[in-house]
A protein has these predicted regions:
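Short glycine-rich, acidic/polar surface loops and turns
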Residues: 55, 90-91
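ATP-dependent carboxylate/acyl-activation modules
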Residues: 1-78, 102-104, 108-132, 138-148
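A short helix->loop->beta-strand "cap" motif at the edges of active sites that frequently abuts
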Residues: 94-102
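Charged helix-capping and loop-helix junction motifs
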Residues: 82-89
Length: 148
């Protein structure tokens, strides 16, 4: 909040920063697609990332969007290859002439996880994603990209 004062979310720390429509957010927003509103009748995005990926593409194609921040979670019970479809979505955004977008993420997982963190990193980096060492690092970089 020191870098970007008005960040809205469907799960904000401050209730006055609740986003009006999480499927069609405006301004600087962080949307948690694992929140109850998105998982009623569907699997969590760690298991089925299709809603998150579709929303990421939709939002990244908007002309006012410059930075997309996300995380990838690995481990037992998670999607078998979460970065494969995600990398394709990001390549499609860049192919649509949106080269001026920054995609940043962190990976929560290990090389020993069934999805192999090294493999996930390679897939994302090959799509043009800046893969950070932690979610706090990714958020810090995203904030600095937005204000420059």
């Amino acid at each position: 909040s020191e870098i970007i004062p008005d960040v809205y979310s469907n799960a904000p720390l401050d209730p006055k920063h609740v986003v009006a429509d999480a499927l069609n957010p405006e301004g600087h927003c962080l949307i948690d697609y694992g929140e109850d509103a998105f998982t009623q009748g569907r699997l969590h995005p760690m298991i089925d990332p299709s809603l998150r990926n579709a929303q990421m593409k939709k939002q990244a194609l908007r002309p006012e969007v410059g930075v997309v921040l996300f995380d990838v979670v690995l481990g037992f019970g998670c999607h078998e290859n979460p970065s494969e479809e995600l990398a394709q979505v990001i390549k499609e955004v860049y192919a649509a002439g949106k080269e001026n977008r920054y995609f940043l993420c962190s990976i929560t997982g290990l090389d020993e996880d069934p999805q192999d963190a090294r493999k996930q990193r390679q897939l994302l980096e090959s799509a043009g994603v800046i893969v950070c060492g932690s979610n706090s690092e990714a958020a810090y970089i995203a904030g600095n990209l937005i204000v420059r």
